Design a protein with these regions (language model features):
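Nucleotidyltransferase catalytic core that binds NTPs
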Residues: 1-101
Length: 101
């Protein structure tokens, strides 16, 4: 009998302006929380001035990480992306701990 286990999909989103050790800890934790890690990098338009590094360079930084299976450019509200992708797990950074999820 063939064992067909469903992969647990994890989603992380953010602007990832200047990739730093905190981002790396977040990505490692996210990968440990599932099998397939999708990282949504906020577009320059969505980041609204929070990102000083252009989106293509921020995406390149995330794609270079071996924990990340897929990188996408986030050009819609993150709630809409979650509804569309329906990941099993959504990981938010510490800066979101006091916000409604």
């Amino acid at each position: 009998m063939e064992n067909k286990r469903k992969l647990t999909t994890v989603l992380v989103s953010g602007n990832f302006n200047v990739l730093h050790p905190g981002h790396l800890r977040l990505l490692r934790f996210a990968k440990e929380s599932g099998d397939y890690l999708i990282v949504a990098v906020e577009s320059d338009r969505i980041a609204e001035g929070a990102a000083h590094v252009p989106e293509d360079l921020r995406i390149e930084g995330i794609k270079s990480n071996s924990w990340v299976n897929e990188t996408i450019l986030l050009e819609e509200p993150v709630g809409d992306l979650i509804k569309r992708l329906q990941p099993d797990v959504v990981i938010k950074g510490k800066e979101h701990q006091d916000k409604f999820n």
